[in-house]
């Protein structure tokens, strides 16, 4: 590929180690129009948790399937991914406290849309930090947590991406690998 851009120029650039198969394209959607587009053109669909079952069950997943069928595709061939906001710790207070780091998630979209300075966003988020946990699956009980997460599998998601809020990610990964992942695999494969 030859390219003459403002900052970069290439002359007959190529990739020598091309993948054996085409790179899958995953399309993110937060509403039915984008989900339908993902069904028509994507290899996978991605959305985020914490928005209420009605959005997934009644809007996003049906629109994804509608888009796939309209394109003559089998909807079951499209991977359904969801980024699940989880705060799991053997200490419930710590699990709750960890969610405060992402307090901005508790702000309504209309309050965030015109904030461009991270310091201003942080200040605004402090006003709702005590409500941040509402956007997360918070638990200290492994069985309870597996039930919370499994709900997304039951809704029809085929790939779960876990997002933990705390600042000790090593601790989270160790606890999740020991306490949660084996239980999820045992129950749902």
Question: Which residue stretches match the model-derived regions?
Answer:
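Active-site-adjacent structural elements that line small-molecule/cofactor binding pockets in enzymes
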Residues: 1-189
